[in-house]
Amino acid sequence: MRVSEALMAGKEKKAMTIHEFGDKSNPVLMLFPGTMCYWKGNFGHVIDALSQRFLVAAVAYTGFDENDSEGYTSMTDELEKIEAYIRDHYNGTIRAAYGCSLGGSFVAQLAARHRVHMRYGIIGSSDLDQAGRLKARLLSALMVKVTYNFIHTGEYRSRLMQRRFLRQMAAP
């Protein structure tokens, strides 16, 4: 494992740690954890397998790493550090980025800002993409059953859900 700190150019040093795993000659896969999540908690169980084919770069936002005493300031500050890191360490290009929850917002911003290049951006939802297979299938089936009719007709099949929806839409 290699650990690097990303710094904002021309500003005081504020740590944001990138934990790297795998061969530097492999394509880069950046992993962005969710809100208030420790990178090992989100990704520790998949890093070994991913590092066989990728240089895995797990992001630890400022204030969210065991050796970091700084505090998280803003998404924009972190985004600038991430972009600077990608430019400085990966020549401005990564193969893919995956983010769940808040991490998905970082992936979307990287794509929208066009300051670095990534071939694939994967935006996940920690509710389903980190669940076990059975749990994810059950939750997906439930969500389809609850939302399918609403998506196609604008109304919920369940009278209780429809009344609640209308009540919430009428509230100021």
Regions found by a protein language model. Name each.
Residues 43-44, 68-71, 132-137:
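Short aromatic-enriched loop/helix-cap "lid" or pocket-rim segments at secondary-structure transitions
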Residues 99-107:
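Gly/Ala-rich beta-loop-alpha elbow adjacent to hydrolase catalytic centers
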